[in-house]
Amino acid sequence: MPMINVRLIEGVFDDSQKREMIEKLTDAMVEIEGENMRSVTWCVVEEVKSGDWGMGGRGVPAEAVLAKKNAVAA
């Protein structure tokens, strides 16, 4: 049975977006493995506390990710 793990910084994605991720990631797995795998495909969303995520040797707070996300959307 497929297991998909997704790690996100807490506070960047809302519940609706996380549900959409689960649906679309499951759909992607089913596209590869076949429809019979849908019922046994697990998708786990883990949220890492803001600031406990690091990149380039520095902690990355949710606010920094949201600012970048909003800049791309503009």
What positions do the PLM features span?
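A domain-level signal for the structural core that forms small-molecule/cofactor-binding pockets
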Residues: 2-74
